[in-house]
Amino acid sequence: MGLLDGKVGLVVGVANDRSYAWHIAKEIIANGGQCAYAHIPGEKNARRTMRAAEKLSPNPILYECDAGSDEDIEVLFSDYAKDHERLDFLIHSIAYADRDWLQIGKFAETPRKAFLEAMDISAYTLVAMSHRARPLMAKNGGGSIMAMSY
């Protein structure tokens, strides 16, 4: 019997089989849990996430979500709720920064707008997703939210 037998949740941030989110999902599944996955919009991202998720379990369920869009986050959790009876955990493992400002010698020149966009995607989305996850978790007496820090 696994520690997570019967637990079902959403993992956000599986980009490939080297991402932290993928390794977390691997351990969840190894301990009896089930994972659904959210990925960045676009067919290329869907294929990449599907390839990684299929290494963990057959027929993974994927959802598309632009984490910078409150509407997309709402749709993500609405669609998840239609497909699953429960949400026991949310794994938030996403980050974003405009690569132009990650170049050597550019960091100190990062404009406020680019910095705030990085904070919105990398940090605020945890709050937005937690807000949408909470009512789904409450239906079964609560749940767990885990986020990667950067």
Predicted regions and their residues:
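Catalytic Tyr-X3-Lys loop
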Residues: 88, 106-128, 142, 146
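Rossmann-fold cofactor-recognition segment
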Residues: 53-71
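Residues in the short beta-alpha loop(s) of Rossmann-like NAD(P)-binding domains
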Residues: 41-43
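Canonical Rossmann dinucleotide-binding motif of NAD(H)/NADP(H)-dependent dehydrogenases/reductases
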Residues: 2-38
